[in-house]
A protein has these predicted regions:
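Protease-associated
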Residues: 42, 49, 53-128, 137-141
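Residue patterns forming the tRNA-binding/recognition surfaces of aminoacyl-tRNA synthetases
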Residues: 1-38, 51, 99-103, 109-111, ...
Length: 212
């Protein structure tokens, strides 16, 4: 899995008034499938989850308040703070982030939207979920609900098309480490860690399923 900063284009006024600097403001996303990042068009939040900005390493990063301690630990932040007003953390529910957009750092630097969906949990990650409607049922459903674009750079053979010229012809497994390195070189990768998690496989050939 990887934790990646997406640069925010704008932020809710309540956070700006609390001192969040837009020039250093990001949404910190989490995903177990780096190869789907070229298809990113949204970041999903949980509608009833509280989100805050954390200042660390010279950046303001927005993600779920209840995940701050866990993220700080795995990211190795020696010093961090939750943005506050009058001694109280400034928070906002996921379904209150209207008209907030960001720049996806992979390749074409597409503009994406902050949206929300019931599928977002706090079991792992940041509570801010990379969303690619072209890959996966949950992503597709929430993408259609909010009318975000669907990008599909994977062909019938499971290889990247010319939409992503740097990785055209590569399988998703071959592209994964290259995408991670791309993010690391650009300073947007916060953490890369190996985890064990369930993933659907074809019952006939026993290979991982690629959703398109």
């Amino acid at each position: 899995s990887i934790y990646v900063n997406f640069k925010l284009n704008n932020i809710p006024a309540v956070f700006a008034e609390a001192g969040v600097d837009l020039e250093r403001a990001y949404v910190l996303i989490w995903t177990t499938t780096p190869w789907t990042l070229p298809s990113n068009t949204a970041v999903s939040l949980g509608p009833d989850i509280d989100y805050c900005f954390v200042e660390a390493d010279g950046k303001f990063m927005m993600f779920a308040k209840d995940m701050v301690e866990a993220v700080a630990k795995v990211a190795g932040w020696e010093s961090y703070r939750i943005v506050e007003t009058n001694g109280e953390p400034v928070t906002m529910k996921g379904d209150q982030f209207g008209d907030i957009t960001y720049i996806c750092p992979v390749l074409h630097e597409n503009t994406g939207r902050i949206i929300w969906g019931e599928h977002v949990t706090l079991d792992a990650g940041t509570g801010a979920v990379h969303t690619a409607p072209g890959h996966g049922v949950d992503d597709y459903k929430v993408g259609m609900k909010f009318g975000v674009d669907t990008i599909m750079p994977i062909d019938d053979d499971g290889r990247f098309t010319d939409y992503v010229p740097q990785w055209a012809g590569l399988t998703t497994d071959e592209a994964n480490p290259k995408i991670i390195e791309w993010l690391r070189e650009r300073g947007t990768l916060i953490l890369h860690e190996d985890i064990n998690h369930s993933y659907p496989h074809c019952w006939r050939c026993k290979q991982p399923v690629i959703f398109r």
